[in-house]
Regions:
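Low-complexity, acidic/Ser/Thr- and charged residue-rich accessory regions of DNA metabolism proteins
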Residues: 241-242, 278-321
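Gly/Thr-rich phosphate-binding beta-strand-loop-beta motif of the actin/hexokinase/Hsp70
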Residues: 1-21, 107, 139, 208
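Phosphate-backbone recognition surface of nucleic-acid-processing proteins
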Residues: 209-285, 289
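Nucleic-acid-processing active sites and adjacent nucleic-acid-binding tracks
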Residues: 24-54
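Small-residue hinge/turn detector
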Residues: 203-204, 226
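Long, charge-rich intrinsically disordered scaffolds of nucleic-acid metabolism proteins
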Residues: 2, 69, 79-198
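Short glycine-rich phosphate-binding loop at a beta-alpha junction
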Residues: 52-63
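Amphipathic, charged-and-aliphatic alpha-helical interface segments
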Residues: 170-183, 187, 204-218, 259-265
């Protein structure tokens, strides 16, 4: 356990519940989750003569990003941890009450006892790419919704829906080009893109997501951490001889990154030589199709991490094993 001040932050869409621990004593503060709230938080820390506490928060959707980037830009060490870690820590502490204030204090206790590694903020180019990728995903989801509506719509509204679909098609096409131009215009992103593009089965959308959400050695110490970040790590449920549940994907992690790996996993398993070898090996071992798909999603992230770390393109002899 360290003795430096720690600041646990429970993040929600509209507010940040903060718990500051200094020499074993806790102080609480609630601020809005916007630029003014971040400034208020800094002023509150200065009021208590705390200039550089170790800040810890959960990776809750996208709501944590702005506050983490603001605090890191003001030279505060920030750790962003998987919510599953805090949940497990709370279970070990027998915490039964769940409120935002209690969660903030629990996060502070976790930071104090576990001293998690500092989070590395994304570069401006990565931040811009992330915004573009998230916008593209929103447009594609909107397109799917409108297409489903059109199939059952009454004649009175069909033209309006069709016009909206045509507009969405143009926006998606333009945004897809903007994403590619953005990657091509940044030397670091372009180099990483070309390495990821060497992996059979991985397409432009998946490459953009991996680069946008920092699923790389720049932000994680190893591939296992990267897989856990995406929520692709298997979760075992076993106890004694009476409880022996099947391993399942944890899904505690970045949903958009996980979603973008599903179709590439299918393509790789059925349309590439190395993917077919992987599929046949697991099928012969008696693994069901759903498990094989999840395993390939994890494998793709492991391979992506490997080519980025080594700086060498995909090698079927090395990565296909």
């Amino acid at each position: 356990m360290n003795n430096i001040p720690v600041l646990g932050i429970d993040v929600s869409k509209d507010k940040l519940d903060c718990a500051l621990c200094v020499e074993g004593k806790y102080k609480s503060k609630v601020v809005t989750n916007n630029a003014q709230g971040f400034t208020d938080l800094l002023n509150w820390l200065h009021k208590w003569h705390v200039d550089s506490p170790h800040v810890c928060m959960e990776a809750t959707g996208v709501y944590w990003e702005a506050s983490a980037e603001f605090l890191a830009a003001h030279n505060l060490p920030v750790s962003v941890v998987n919510p599953a870690q805090i949940k497990a820590f709370g279970g070990s502490r027998l915490v039964r009450t769940k409120t935002d204030a209690v969660d903030a204090r629990l996060i502070a206790e976790f930071c104090l006892r576990m001293t998690p590694e500092a989070w590395q903020p994304p570069s401006p180019a990565e931040q811009a790419l992330r915004a573009l990728v998230q916008r593209l995903d929103a447009l594609q989801r909107m397109h799917t919704q409108e297409r489903n509506r059109l199939s059952v719509a009454r004649e009175a509204v069909r033209k309006g829906i069709a016009d909206h679909l045509a507009w969405l098609d143009k926006e998606i096409e333009a945004l897809t080009k903007q994403i590619r131009d953005h990657i091509d215009g940044d030397s670091d992103l372009k180099q990483k893109h070309d390495l990821l593009d060497s992996i059979p089965g991985v397409g432009e959308r998946t490459i953009a997501a991996i680069l946008a959400f920092g699923a790389s050695p720049d932000h994680f110490a190893n591939a296992r951490q990267c897989v856990a970040f995406a929520g692709l790590n298997p979760r075992q449920h076993q106890s004694g001889s009476s409880v022996n549940g099947k391993p399942r994907m944890s899904k505690v992690g970045h949903a958009l990154l996980r979603k973008t790996l599903y179709m590439p996993a299918m393509v790789t398993l059925y349309n590439t030589a190395w993917g077919k070898v992987f599929r046949n090996r697991l099928a012969l071992a008696g693994k069901p199709p759903k498990l094989i798909i999840g395993a390939m999603m994890r494998k793709l992230l492991h391979v992506a991490f490997g080519v980025l770390k080594s700086g060498q393109p995909f090698n079927p002899a090395l990565h296909g094993a």
